[in-house]
Amino acid sequence: MRSNIKLLFWFAVIQILSFHFSFTTLAEVPKNYLKGKFYTSVKDHFLVATEKMTDGRFKKAIIVMLDNDEEGAWGLVVNKPIGKVPLNLLINTSQKLKNEKKELYNVEIPIFWGGPVSKEQIYILHSKEYKNQTTESYKDFSITRDYKILFDIAENKGPQRYLIILGYSGWADGQLEGEMEVDHWILSELDSQIVFEEESKNKWPQAYENSFIRL
């Protein structure tokens, strides 16, 4: 009988301690603990605008985050199409070589708005099978800034999947963290299928549905 009472006593103690530990743990969850795991950087995630976003430019935006360090963070919006423009308008005059494939200058190419910074800078976000000397490789895709890739795309010799993006989105050190603190942004797992295959209008709902839930 006594052994049963002791057993019940220690069971009750363990339950109380477990509850206290769980409560303390949840109360002290750090800000970088999302969906059951820690993250040390927003790089290689989707940054997804929430309904609390106050900047109209980023309403229902999803951003592929490319870097996050002590100097800040930057990425490319991938669901804000601008429209189609002739290849000729995407190539800087100083880069146009004499007699280089001028027949392609009028080929129209779809482009996207990547953010309000360096709005004339072109980034080609694409699948990894395509490479040239300026290609930078990331986890699930690559980025090329060499204008010659545009000619390859116009000739159907470019990457299988791509987005041509003008400008980028950038934050100073601590700025993005402040915006996340007031729930203007939430993180979501990066998915190349959403980036390249989904229609623009469907990208935000898909990314938001897959977003991390803050504890």
Residue ranges and their predicted role:
Residues 2-11:
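Bacterial N-terminal signal peptides that target proteins for export
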